[in-house]
């Protein structure tokens, strides 16, 4: 399953005809198993110059799926004849794929940061040793500092990465509940952008939300009760989509973000303002000016098609400006785009158009940009790290 983006096919899910066809690696790797992500899981067995991505296993959220995952790993391992010496896994200790990895008998276990793996998957597909500048935009992934990342610009080779820039984080009031009840995301973003006094009465989104719920959500954020911070670009799609579409709930992963993408006016070229804070490390892409302007457009009853298009254009402009500053400080390196947000054709094609012809940009093609391609990145990172041990 996939679509055409920027004139080339991009796979979203590898299945019959692609699995278990090997992906050719530019450099040989030791025998290893990369266990993949928690959502949209695939795993990867690799040895020499061949990497074999397993089939789409789905979300490892119940015992039946986990049992199927374990059987499929064993089946493909027998089929390709690989006895892994290294087991690679995500940093997140609660992922079932991580727990499976840590329970295996092999002694060499290597944890790979989620967004480094996203970038490395595209590097592996295109034979890039690095350094590259990787743009990894998705919903969430555990960062090396213990917070939720997902709006990242990294300077990376296969063994190392440096976090150069990130999106300003959004508080998730209620944790994962905020990803389902997206009005919570919107409220947190609005309070941050408007210094606690957003124009809620002018937004249809909040007309059906009880005042008590709003007050409780604000108290959770103020007192930091079960309210982790999330840097994910996907959370901005959810929050702005909630505001612009008056969508209080997301009934499946990415629902509001996809609706927000689909309504965008293809002909709209305007954008909102943004700021880039370069005083610390990482730099922070601050979209609060955009949030304020987009919200007032919604209050003034400007249609969601225009607001969505301007949101997309602003995220593209902020990313491109950051990449230009990165190049000034770190030199000219290839740019890699990865993460689930780059399944969004408008975002991807617009960013490519903005960066051309000054940047060499690489997209995933035969490996999904989302978590379905993560295991390939885990595999090549783990091999590179193991060679330094």
Segments predicted by a language model, with ranges:
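Conserved phosphate-binding/catalytic loops in two-lobed NTP-binding clefts
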Residues: 90, 107-118, 333-338, 345, ...
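Glycine-rich phosphate-binding/hydrolytic loop that grips phosphoryl groups
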Residues: 116-137, 141-143, 182-191, 238, ...
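Short beta-strand scaffold segments in enzyme catalytic cores
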Residues: 1-3, 41-46, 135, 151-155, ...
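Short glycine-rich phosphate-binding loop at a beta-alpha junction
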Residues: 81-93, 330-341
